[in-house]
Amino acid sequence: MPNWGGGKKCGVCQKTVYFAEEVQCEGNSFHKSCFLCMVCKKNLDSTTVAVHGEEIYCKSCYGKKYGPKGYGYGQGAGTLSMDKGESLGIKHEEAPGHRPTTNPNASKFAQKIGGSERCPRCSQAVYAAEKVIGAGKSWHKSCFRCAKCGKGLESTTLADKDGEIYCKGCYAKNFGPKGFGFGQGAGALVHSE
């Protein structure tokens, strides 16, 4: 059939689209009334349209049909849909059933993740409100002291050896270099035999 009016053809109904009712998208023309999602039939505009070949979709239906698969995809932030997409021709695969863990140290893992960690000094549970981390372990604030002199420590002012924590002074005296001038402070010269 000849195109006497010279207008463009609608990408949906293939009828002539006149200027007053034309919506353009990716080089194609549509009637305003035909510019609808091919699945849910919602009205579209330049901010809500998603194009796949010659087909137009709202972003939600496009995401369900062509985006990542799984619960929560294609809806937008903060939503979870149980729609598996059968209406879009998506085949659903059943997930394998739950199998119990084969980890022999499952109780240690559960203790770290599900329960509370234990303080290395007193072996009691350490909860978030009283936790201080030092030497890679969680301590009670009251237990976070030098093992020799009992001085309170900061995570930046400690030294650790064999699972215990020390202030820098006690660590230097007990585990540092031995000999003239070591471990006594500035200006001291001590002979040790």
UniProtKB/Swiss-Prot annotation:
Mind telling me which GO cellular component terms the entry cites? cytoplasm; nucleus; Z disc
Sorted alphabetically, the keyword list is: Acetylation, Isopeptide bond, LIM domain, Metal-binding, Nucleus, Phosphoprotein, Repeat, Ubl conjugation, Zinc
N6-acetyllysine (modified residue): where? Answer: 84, 112, 131, 137, 161
User: According to its UniProt record, where is this protein mainly located?
Assistant: nucleus
Which residues does the UniProt record annotate as the domain LIM zinc-binding? 10-61, 119-170
Subcellular location as annotated: Nucleus
Q: Where is this motif: Nuclear localization signal?
A: 64-69
**Keyword Nucleotide-binding: yes or no?**
no
Q: Which residues carry this modification: Phosphoserine?
A: 81, 192
**Position(s) of the covalent cross-link Glycyl lysine isopeptide (Lys-Gly) (interchain with G-Cter in SUMO2)?**
91
Single GO term (MF): actinin binding
Under Pfam families, the record lists: LIM
Q: Name one GO biological process term.
A: sarcomere organization
Q: How does it assemble?
A: Interacts with ASCC1; ASCC2 and TRIP4.
Report the protein's function.
Answer: Could play a role in neuronal development.
Entry-linked PANTHER family: CYSTEINE AND GLYCINE-RICH PROTEIN 1, RHO-GTPASE-ACTIVATING PROTEIN LRG1
What protein is this chain from? Answer: Cysteine and glycine-rich protein 1
Query: Lineage from the top down?
Result: Eukaryota, Metazoa, Chordata, Craniata, Vertebrata
Q: Which gene encodes it?
A: Csrp1
